[in-house]
A protein has these predicted regions:
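Extreme N-terminal signal-anchor transmembrane helix of membrane signaling/transducer proteins, especially
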Residues: 1-26, 198
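Extracellular/periplasmic ligand-binding regions of membrane signal-transduction receptors
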Residues: 28, 36, 40-80, 110-116, ...
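Short N-terminal helix-loop-first-beta-strand/juxtamembrane motif that initiates sensory/input modules
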Residues: 44, 83-104, 141-143, 194-198
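Extracytoplasmic/periplasmic sensor domains and loops in membrane signaling proteins
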Residues: 68-81, 110-151
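Amphipathic coiled-coil signal-relay and dimerization helices
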Residues: 103-109, 156
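Extracytoplasmic
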Residues: 127-196
């Protein structure tokens, strides 16, 4: 009888241990899936915005080109259209435009940079962000991950940007969104998991 009781106790402990382990594993899987889903959502959001912006630029180009308007005036019309656009709840999303050689054509939040070649600009981790965005655009569009300040001379935060090319003028056009909120939420969830581990 005693051996039976001991066996039942061991079995019960094993069941509890497996359930506890499964709980931790499920929690880790949830955090991983949350992170992937949040980043995928932002990537799709950026891509959709840029698809619309490219269609807008193409429409302006075709309409004005058909009227015999000069390329200089067409470029001005496209850039004027993009200049005041802001996206997302924090209004920190904007359209930036660069020539393929890295020269800034449109930088709405820092006009002093327009006309400068920024191809050599690196983020705090050594990512040549303009160069990579141009390469992504030339390949048909793509996402680049880097760190960028929210304010001039401020602390850099993780950011996703999606870039497309506008072939008539050899432009790279893009927009980005800060993703530090995702990292903060993941860190918060990991802290909760650590409490479960104790």
């Amino acid at each position: 009888l005693i051996s039976l009781i001991l066996s039942l106790i061991v079995l019960g402990a094993c069941i509890i241990g497996v359930a506890y382990s499964n709980t931790k594993n499920n929690a880790r899987m949830f955090i991983d899936e949350y992170e992937k889903s949040a980043y995928a959502f932002h990537e799709n959001e950026l891509k959709n915005i840029m698809d619309i912006m490219k269609q807008t630029a193409e429409s302006i180009y075709k309409t004005q080109k058909a009227k015999g308007i000069s390329d200089e005036k067409i470029q001005e019309a496209i850039l004027d259209k993009f200049n005041d656009l802001r996206f997302f709840d924090d209004k920190e999303g904007y359209i930036f435009v660069y020539k393929y050689d890295g020269t800034s054509v449109l930088f709405p939040t820092n006009k002093t940079q327009e006309g400068k070649n920024l191809i050599a600009v690196k983020d705090s981790n050594g990512v040549f962000l303009i160069k990579e965005l141009i390469e992504a655009a030339k390949k048909g569009g793509g996402l680049v991950k880097y760190h960028f300040p929210k304010t001039k001379d401020g602390k850099p935060f993780p950011k996703f940007s999606y870039a497309l090319s506008f072939e008539p003028y050899n432009w790279m056009m893009g927009t980005g969104i800060y993703v530090d909120n995702v990292e903060e939420e993941v860190a918060h969830l990991q802290k909760i998991l650590m409490k479960i581990d104790r």
